[in-house]
């Protein structure tokens, strides 16, 4: 398998500029038919899925995820042919009879419950299995710990972890992300030093940037989406239009 990947890459028709991803692709099926890919947001998990897909471009590939946004993301990122996308709910439904593929790829595995994963494995017929996700991201609504504990009993030859982030090269941000991810007790220091954390006051309602992003922890409460939206809308001079129980103005922020 590794020799086949090397030969494919040496032809020069397809390039992988990340040594980390190149090594993962070269080795993931060298000793196993199952590959588990772990990585935090921004480390290129979707990009690696695309690399795998292009190597197996002539094989039939099935891509599954728990949510429609995750499925749509794979559909946008994967450029290879012979592909089919579906949500897990649709795949395991009784109506679905399309269950055979050469390569089965499941994304955002941390959101997939143990029960649904078992149903997928029982229903699908495949030669190679690729499981992708981040155990620190959103958990399954129903009980689902299989992706977290799988690396404790699956062969190390089948486990690959992407660690290099691509969304920023800012060392201060990378330090904050790493400490948050690892629940490091020293998280406060870099947040204060780099001014990523400030005391909330009335200044948050003042327009400071043309391209502002507002993140709210919930819908209700003083700093919830609903209240923040009302404050910002009241300062918007545009004409208000009522639609149902809501008021909308041109120029309203999207929260």
Please identify what each model-predicted range represents.
Residues 2-12, 19-36, 41-48, 54-55, ...:
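Conserved helicase motor core of P-loop NTPases
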Residues 107-108, 133:
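Walker B catalytic acidic pair
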Residues 62-103:
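Inter-Walker segment of RecA-like/P-loop motor cores
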Residues 115-127:
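Short, conserved "post-DEAD/DEAH" coupling segment immediately C-terminal to helicase motif II
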Residues 111-113, 138-139:
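Catalytic P-loop NTPase motifs of RecA-like helicase/translocase cores
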Residues 101-103, 126-130:
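Loop/turn-to-beta-strand initiation segments
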Residues 55-62:
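Post-Walker A helix-loop "phosphate-sensing" segment adjacent to the P-loop in P-loop NTPases
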Residues 63, 131, 214-216:
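Structural beta-sheet core signal
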């Amino acid at each position: 398998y590794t020799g086949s990947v090397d030969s494919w890459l040496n032809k020069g028709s397809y390039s992988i500029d990340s040594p980390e991803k190149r090594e993962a692709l070269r080795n993931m099926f060298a000793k196993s038919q199952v590959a588990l890919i772990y990585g935090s947001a921004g480390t290129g998990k979707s990009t690696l899925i695309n690399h795998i897909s292009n190597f197996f471009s002539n094989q039939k590939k099935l891509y599954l995820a728990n949510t429609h946004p995750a499925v749509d993301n794979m559909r946008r990122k994967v450029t290879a042919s012979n592909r089919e996308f579906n949500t897990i709910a649709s795949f395991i439904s009784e109506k679905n009879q399309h269950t055979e593929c050469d390569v089965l790829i499941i994304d955002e595995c941390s959101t997939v419950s143990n029960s649904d994963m078992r149903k997928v494995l029982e229903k699908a017929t495949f030669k190679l299995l690729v499981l992708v996700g981040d155990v620190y991201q959103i958990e399954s609504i129903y009980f689902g710990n299989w992706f977290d504990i799988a690396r404790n009993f699956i062969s190390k030859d089948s486990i690959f972890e992407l660690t290099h982030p691509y969304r920023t090269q800012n060392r201060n941000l990378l330090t904050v992300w790493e400490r948050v991810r690892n629940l490091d007790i020293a998280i406060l220091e870099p947040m204060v030093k780099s001014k990523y954390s400030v005391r909330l006051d009335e200044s948050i309602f003042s327009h400071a940037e043309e391209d502002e992003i507002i993140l709210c922890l919930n819908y209700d409460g003083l700093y919830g989406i609903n209240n923040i939206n009302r404050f910002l809308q009241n300062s918007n001079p545009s004409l208000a239009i009522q639609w149902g129980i809501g008021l909308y103005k041109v120029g309203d922020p999207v929260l």
